[in-house]
A protein has these predicted regions:
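N-terminal organelle-targeting presequences
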Residues: 1-94
Length: 94
């Protein structure tokens, strides 16, 4: 008699938090890079910007930077893309 292997269903997206995203950015690239969501031709893109919080010429205060990251994170969570973004931030070769 053959054994039936259980099917592993994908886990629902656990929401991202601003703190988690900032921690991933710092761990991955050793800097708190800014993020932006961009819509082009009906598609959404998450961009890691060249500017980062620790840079002397960074135009935002730390509080404003964190608010901006939280805005991006809320949008990503609302689209149900938390796991995809989490995985991309951790594994991207860019």
């Amino acid at each position: 008699m053959s054994r039936i292997q259980p099917v592993r269903l994908p886990e629902p997206d656990q929401p991202l938090s601003g703190k988690e995203v900032i921690a991933i950015l710092r761990e991955r690239w050793s800097a708190s890079y800014d993020l932006q969501l961009l819509q082009r031709n009906g598609r959404m893109y998450l961009q890691v910007m060249w500017a980062y919080l620790e840079q002397q010429t960074f135009p935002l205060s730390e509080a404003d930077y964190r608010l901006g990251i939280e805005r991006v994170v809320r949008a990503v969570n609302a689209m149900g893309q938390a796991n995809m973004v989490r995985r991309w931030l951790r594994t991207s070769r860019d």
